[in-house]
Amino acid sequence: DELGQRRDGQADVALDVVRSFTDKVISPRAEHVHRYNEDVPEEIISGLAEMGAFGLSVPAEYGGFSEGGQGEYMAMVVATEELSRGSLGIGGSLITRPEILTRALVKGGTEAQKQEWLPKLATAEVMVAVAVTEPDYGSDVAGIKVTAVPATGPEGQAGYVINGVKTWCTFAGRADVLMLLARTDPDRSKTHRGLSLFIVPKPRGDAHGFEFTQNVRDDGSVGKMEGRPIDTIGYRGMHSYEIALENWWVPATNLIGEESGLGKGFYYQMEGFENGRLQTAARAVGVMQAAYEAAYDYAHNRTVFGNNVAEYQLTQVKLGRMAVLIQAGRQFGYEVAKLMAKGEGTTEASMVKAYVCKAAEWVAREAMQIHGGF
């Protein structure tokens, strides 16, 4: 039951369109992809692109649908929730990573970079994986070791060679580019102020591992990129990877902000990550809604001792409490979206992520209990 939701017109339109796509395309394929650890079907990516789901945060002047303001954030939240109701692995997470890069570009990209990349992000011509976490540095982003050092390209162009290892790079096999945070200042005492953000093009790779090479210089030196898949219990379909880069060259024009972006990568990245926390909460609401619907349906169709499971008071209490948490999480997310539209809500975005994800654990467990181990 979704009574009491407070959305605006733009969000309602997004909800109706995405809900139809979720029910017709995503939900029927979700279990098969999860059980067999297959790839996200291309028809899902192309379908979401056709309806404009990847352009919700891309400014209209660059081929997207964003006019700024509250509607943009609300539309993203309701779309993310609805896609996650169908599948977390092949639905809800797909639009998050392009949106993170979009916000980083809007924040710090040059006009040429915006013209080059934002239209491609809006249409899914370019799909993105985020390469920030490293084996020894997760939340401690300021300590990362992957380096980007100035180096000329095969035709003498200015650029950088990237060396090091990134991990938990979701969707990195299928992605066309990595949004990669690297250390451009060797003075580690500068911590996060020595980091810069790059758009790193790559070929599309196999879901179960990939290895690419590139000729970097006239001396025949070769750049290498190798992706090792990390098996996961959930989030199947997008696949996560550990990526090793050795002398992988990128042009200087792919440094977000170009020369003026040196040392500002952490701030550009956080512009995307803050809204990513809100989207994580929205995904959790979608998972809760799916769990509730499955439990509700089962309880009303399963007969035990002559009665439907739903007729027993304990089941009714469980369903009632689940509904309370779902609606609380949903409305919390809406309010944070409104704050973020005003340039506020950084702390609240972390709060809603922490609260709703914890609630989703409980709701999913209660749904399993109602199923009685079925």
Q: Which residues does each PLM region occupy?
A:
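A short core secondary-structure module
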Residues: 158-159, 163-223
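Long, acidic (Asp/Glu-rich), low-complexity accessory segments flanking structured domains
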Residues: 246-267
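Active-site-adjacent elements of ketosynthase-type condensing enzymes
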Residues: 136-145, 210-215
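A structural signal for short hydrophobic beta-strand segments in well-ordered beta-sheet cores
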Residues: 146-150
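A short, Trp-centered hydrophobic/proline-enriched beta-strand micro-motif
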Residues: 124-132
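Alpha-helical interface subdomain recognition
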Residues: 1-85, 96, 108-109, 113, ...
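Short Gly/Pro-enriched turn/cap motifs at secondary-structure boundaries
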Residues: 136-139, 168-171, 188-189, 231-239
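Flexible, small-/acidic-enriched active-site or ligand-binding loops
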Residues: 206-248
